From Swiss-Prot:
InterPro entries: 3-IsopropMal_deHydase_ssu, Aconitase/3IPM_dehydase_swvl, AconitaseA/IPMdHydase_ssu_swvl, IPMI_Swivel, LeuD
Organism: Albidiferax ferrireducens (strain ATCC BAA-621 / DSM 15236 / T118) (Rhodoferax ferrireducens)
Subunit structure: Heterodimer of LeuC and LeuD.
The protein's name in its UniProt record: 3-isopropylmalate dehydratase small subunit
Function summary: Catalyzes the isomerization between 2-isopropylmalate and 3-isopropylmalate, via the formation of 2-isopropylmaleate.
GO cellular component: 3-isopropylmalate dehydratase complex
Single GO term (MF): 3-isopropylmalate dehydratase activity
Family recorded in the similarity comment: Belongs to the LeuD family. LeuD type 1 subfamily.
NCBIfam families: leuD (TIGR00171), PRK01641.1 (NF002458)
Pathway: Amino-acid biosynthesis; L-leucine biosynthesis; L-leucine from 3-methyl-2-oxobutanoate: step 2/4
EC number: 4.2.1.33
C-alpha cells in the first residue's frame, strides 16, 4: 500500500449528498477476479452518457460533459470534496479501490457510511471529516478559484488552504500509523513473519502429528 504523508492536490467538488457505493462503482463492474481496473468505471453512470460493460475501452464511451470529473478544470484531481453520508449503500471494497485507482488519495466530507469509512483506511485512502460549515466553505472556494488545491499533512493532521489557513482534522492513531507507513492488513501481518515462523516451528516440534495429519 502506498504511504500517505503529505499530499498537495487539486480538489474536485462533488456537490451531492448520500453518494452510495453503487454510484461510486456500479455492480456490473464487480465481476472481475482482480483488484485492478476499477478506476475507469468510477461514477460510471454519471460520468458517461452511454451504458458501459466490463472490459469496454473507455475511449469508446460518450463522456457526460456536465459531470464534474469530466470538466477540464478538475482533470488530475487527487482530493474529492463531497457532502454528507458519502459511501452509503451496500458494502463493497471495490468503492475505495475505484477511487484510488482513478487517482484520488483523500476525500473530505461531513460524514461517511461506516463500512466505506473503514474500507478506505485499509486501502490507503484517507477519508477526512470536517463540519458541514467547513465543507461548504471549501465548496465555495473550489467553485470560485480554478485550480483550487489543498495540502493535507497527515503527520500534523491539518489541511492547509491556499491562503495558508489550516483546518485540523481527527484521525485514529493506529489508522494514521498504517497510512504513514503504507501498511495494509497483509503488510502488518508480514511484519511479524519471523515470529510466525518461529511459532509454527515450535508448534510442529511439540506436536509433530499435526504435520503428518496435514500431509496425509
Amino acid at each position: 500500500m502506498q504511504k500517505f504523508t503529505l499530499l498537495k492536490g487539486l480538489v474536485a467538488p462533488m456537490d451531492r449528498e448520500n453518494v452510495d457505493t453503487d454510484a461510486i462503482i456500479p455492480k456490473q463492474f464487480l465481476k472481475s477476479i482482480r483488484k485492478t481496473g476499477f478506476g475507469q468505471n468510477l461514477f460510471d453512470e454519471w460520468r458517461y452518457l452511454d451504458a458501459g460493460f466490463p472490459g469496454q475501452d473507455p475511449k469508446s464511451r460518450k463522456p457526460n460533459p456536465d459531470f464534474v470529473l469530466n470538466q477540464p478544470r478538475y482533470q488530475g484531481a487527487s482530493i474529492l470534496l463531497a457532502r454528507k453520508n458519502f459511501g452509503c449503500g451496500s458494502s463493497r471494497e471495490h468503492a475505495p479501490w475505484a477511487l484510488d485507482q482513478y487517482g484520488f488519495r483523500a476525500i473530505i466530507a461531513p460524514s461517511y457510511a461506516d463500512i466505506f469509512f473503514n474500507n478506505s483506511f485499509k486501502n490507503g485512502l484517507l477519508p477526512i471529516v470536517l463540519s458541514e460549515i467547513q465543507v461548504s466553505q471549501l465548496f465555495d472556494e473550489a467553485a470560485a478559484f480554478p485550480g483550487y488545491a489543498l495540502t493535507i499533512d497527515l503527520e500534523r493532521q491539518v489541511i492547509i488552504k491556499p491562503d495558508g489557513k489550516e483546518l485540523p482534522f481527527e484521525v485514529q492513531a493506529f489508522r494514521k500509523y498504517c497510512l504513514l507507513n503504507g501498511f495494509d492488513d497483509i503488510g502488518l501481518t508480514l511484519r511479524q513473519a519471523d515470529k510466525i515462523k518461529a511459532f509454527e516451528a515450535q508448534r510442529l516440534a511439540q506436536k509433530p502429528w499435526l504435520a503428518r495429519t496435514l500431509l496425509a
